[in-house]
Amino acid sequence: MLEPNVLVTALQDLRDNGFLSDALLRRAVKDIAAADDRFDWVGVYLVNSEENVVWLHNYVGKPTPHSKIPLGEGICGTAIAEGKNATVPDVSAVDNYIVCDPRVKSEMVVLIRGDDEIFGLIDIDSRTIEAFTDEDSEAVQMVTDKLAEQLAQERS
């Protein structure tokens, strides 16, 4: 089970010691992936507004051919385009689902957002149908809020 307070504290420690967003993003993905057996693939995508895509920064899990996803396509691109998190209990029910691994049954996307900007998202896939709970989403949101603080600071 993800313990968001522990991870948020670790991310803040990295910030306090001068580490930049790259280190925080990698730590978040690694720790989220290790936190729960239901989390079969965890990755972070960042927004590239010039190309109108999200691009894969780093991940833990099976390699994916989808290093760039157009905004508005798939669960990740749609979450960014609509500006809201997404929890999909059964990916086979989603018309524009982009298959990375045919064994994936459910997916959760939590945006990394600052006040007026969406920086990216954390994407979590599971081979279990209906794998994700509201508590999972809330826990990951605590982590993405901390990541957003760092990304906003670096862009200011």
Task: Provide a role label for each language-model segment.
Residues 118:
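Glycine-rich acetyl-CoA-binding "A-motif" of GNAT/NAT acetyltransferases
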Residues 126-156:
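Juxtadomain coupling helices with adjacent low-complexity linkers
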Residues 87, 111, 123:
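Conserved beta-strand segments that form the floor/walls of ligand-binding pockets within enzyme
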Residues 47-100:
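Regulatory sensory and allosteric helical modules in signal-transduction proteins
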